[in-house]
């Protein structure tokens, strides 16, 4: 009986006859030979159908079969050094499973809006396939890393009655007779978890009602948010760089084929596995921008062009330390020797990709935190549970948040966050 395999396992069956369930992505013919481009969800490779070596019925089917038709193919695996994948199948038999009508995403060029309108089908193509495989590896490596480091996974609520950074960018919903919001961060709940379990991380969707159309913004995206008790900011930075380097190394180790499909320079990625990452102060970053004739003054937040320029100046990710208090959230701990900045940092990815992590040591003093909440104009009653964490055995603790799609965009070397998530949600897109 012929063995049934996946395309990805072809390397283990060279010169063997196998059977594979596939979809047709493209084809061409030279008259006596048909070349079928095939996929099965694990990889892409080529099927070669030689007229003199198959029945007339099989060769005619190879000529007539339509793009995205599904079929069983039987044949012998051979090496193919010309392809990214490295193997092909010499087809001896084809059994049609499901015919396809006129498939809308043809091999020709299509505009991005057309492709996003057909995202449910575009996912089948090589580029999104490679990106989603790398996304999956980053998710797998995230769980592995934090498990190895002694963290517990904790699931914060998606519906919340309070907002960690104010309510200006929150999606409001009616919650029976009350107001509620879709979460924009699991951090406050992760802090509660850290006081119970020591080291926790959250990993889930968050929502930002930002009316932005830039390549770096989505309204729905995924965040990894670790929180660590008895840990100061410098120690947190070490965890952050170790985690990012771990993600990059695992993508290199497990997604070489997908990186080749994206033409991503693996040697470039290897540089990002070397730690520690460089660190500069916010003050120094402003000086660098001013020296490059950027219109910025101390106290301004960095925009995308600023972060792009700064990250371009380093061959590795770089930490920007100690931002002004006026441009960061209320829960951060002030610097011990400066009242105007926080013990915080953003990690900027190189190659112009900008911020992928934001983090800080958290304020532990009850009175100071209460005063900060009031100064923000937030309802203090909504935060009594959060203040309880300072009432009962407060300890130094730190945390950070990594935007999954931003990390994917950088590691894959792509231009826009919309390609880093299966079904992107943006200001002008909520379908399919």
Swiss-Prot record:
Its main location: cytoplasm. Homodimer. CDD domains: AsnRS_cyto_like_N (cd04323), AsxRS_core (cd00776). It is found in: Cytoplasm. The gene is asnS. This is Asparagine--tRNA ligase. GO terms for molecular function: asparagine-tRNA ligase activity; ATP binding; catalytic activity, acting on a protein; nucleic acid binding; transferase activity. It comes from the Bacteria. Its EC number is 6.1.1.22. The lineage of its organism: Bacteria, Bacillati, Bacillota, Bacilli, Lactobacillales. It comes from Latilactobacillus sakei subsp. sakei (strain 23K). Belongs to the class-II aminoacyl-tRNA synthetase family. It is an enzyme of class 6 (ligase).
């Amino acid at each position: 009986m012929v063995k049934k395999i996946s395309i990805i396992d072809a390397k283990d069956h060279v010169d063997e006859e196998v059977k594979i369930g596939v979809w047709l992505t493209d084809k061409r013919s030279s008259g006596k030979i048909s070349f079928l481009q095939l996929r099965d969800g694990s990889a892409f490779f080529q099927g070669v159908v030689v007229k003199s070596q198959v029945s007339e019925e099989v060769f005619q089917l190879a000529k007539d079969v339509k793009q995205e038709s599904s079929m069983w193919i039987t044949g012998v695996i051979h090496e193919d050094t010309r392809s990214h994948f490295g193997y092909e199948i010499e087809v001896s038999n084809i059994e049609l499973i499901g015919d396809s009508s006129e498939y809308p995403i043809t091999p020709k060029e299509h505009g991005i809006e057309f492709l996003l309108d057909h995202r449910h089908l575009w996912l089948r193509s090589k580029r999104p396939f490679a990106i989603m495989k790398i996304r999956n590896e980053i998710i797998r490596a995230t769980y592995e890393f934090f498990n190895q480091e002694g963290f517990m996974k904790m699931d914060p609520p998606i519906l919340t009655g309070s907002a960690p950074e104010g309510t200006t960018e929150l999606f409001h919903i009616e919650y029976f007779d009350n107001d509620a919001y879709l979460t924009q961060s699991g951090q406050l709940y992760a802090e509660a978890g850290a006081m119970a379990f020591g080291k926790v991380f959250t990993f889930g969707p968050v929502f930002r009602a930002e009316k932005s159309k830039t390549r770096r913004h989505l309204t729905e995206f995924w965040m990894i948010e670790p929180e660590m008790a008895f840990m100061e900011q410098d120690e947190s930075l070490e965890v952050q760089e170790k985690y990012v380097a771990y993600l990059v190394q695992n993508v290199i180790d497990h997604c070489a084929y997908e990186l080749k499909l994206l033409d991503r320079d693996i040697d470039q990625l290897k540089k990002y596995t070397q730690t520690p990452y460089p660190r500069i102060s916010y003050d120094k970053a402003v000086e660098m921008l001013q020296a490059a004739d950027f219109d910025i003054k101390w106290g301004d937040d960095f925009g995308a062009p600023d972060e792009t320029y700064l990250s371009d100046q380093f061959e590795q990710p770089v930490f920007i330390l100690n931002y002004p208090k006026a441009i960061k959230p209320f829960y951060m701990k002030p610097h011990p020797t400066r009242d105007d900045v926080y013990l915080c940092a953003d990690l900027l990815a190189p190659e112009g990709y900008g911020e992928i992590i934001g983090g800080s040591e958290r304020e532990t003093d009850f009175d100071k935190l209460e005063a900060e909440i009031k100064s923000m104009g937030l309802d203090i009653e909504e935060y009594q549970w959060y203040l309880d964490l300072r009432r009962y055995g407060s300890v130094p603790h730190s945390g950070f948040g990594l935007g999954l799609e931003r990390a994917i965009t950088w590691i894959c070397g792509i231009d826009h966050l919309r390609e880093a998530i299966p079904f992107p949600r943006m200001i002008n897109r909520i379908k399919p």
